[in-house]
Curated annotation (Swiss-Prot):
Encoding gene per record: frr
Keyword annotations from UniProtKB, A to Z: Cytoplasm, Protein biosynthesis
Name of the featured protein: Ribosome-recycling factor
One GO biological process term: translational termination
Pfam families attached to this UniProt entry: RRF
Family per record: Belongs to the RRF family.
GO molecular function, a single term: ribosomal large subunit binding
The keyword Methyltransferase belongs to this UniProt entry's keyword annotation: no
Length: 182
């Protein structure tokens, strides 16, 4: 039972790391880079994807079609204020974001950012492992389980931890390849 909870929590950490990776801009248009952009809309911070249809008509363009044309100014301002690093082009109907090709230096910076995100994911997994091992030791101390059972569980916990750490390494390798592909 405990290992299932452990796997579930570690899987959530892997998924959170994947979502973080999705916000990193590569050389290709990807609407998910706008996931963290919020727009002040009638006094409320609202996620951009709730205010507009976001599409990628080609590999270097993101097109934003607001449901309410009156919000175009706020959307444009929100994109400029965000960390996306793109300049919006507003033609009155849609807002276009042209994705410039990444420089070698920018690619290296993005790889460092991805590595940092991966490390944060691994830290979260190690924290889950630490909590699980603490629980096992507490059970052993309270004589709920034997020393051998405790060692076996701790070994199982470490194996699960290694599996999920490897998953994050695989995601990182794929993201690095994606970033460095010209």
């Amino acid at each position: 039972m405990m290992l299932d909870d452990l796997k579930e929590n570690m899987q959530k950490s892997v998924e959170a790391t994947q979502r973080s990776f999705n916000t990193i801009r590569t050389g290709r248009a990807n609407a998910s880079i706008l996931d963290r952009v919020t727009v002040e809309y009638y006094g409320t911070e609202t996620p951009l994807y709730q205010l507009a249809n976001i599409s990628t008509p080609d590999a270097t363009t993101i097109m934003i079609q607001p449901y309410d044309k009156g919000s175009m100014g706020q959307i444009e301002k929100a994109i400029q204020m965000s960390d996306v690093g793109l300049t919006p082009n507003n033609d009155g109907q849609v807002i276009r974001l042209n994705i410039p090709p990444l420089t070698e230096e920018r690619r290296k910076d993005l790889v460092k950012l991805a590595s940092k995100m991966a490390e944060e994911g691994k830290v979260a997994i190690r924290n889950i492992r630490r909590d699980a091992i603490d629980d096992v030791r507490k059970q052993e101390k309270n004589s709920d389980i034997s020393e051998d059972e405790s060692r076996g569980l701790q070994d199982d916990i470490q194996k699960v931890t290694d599996q999920f750490t490897d998953k994050i390494d695989e995601l990182l390798a794929a993201k690095e390849k994606d970033i460095m592909t010209v």
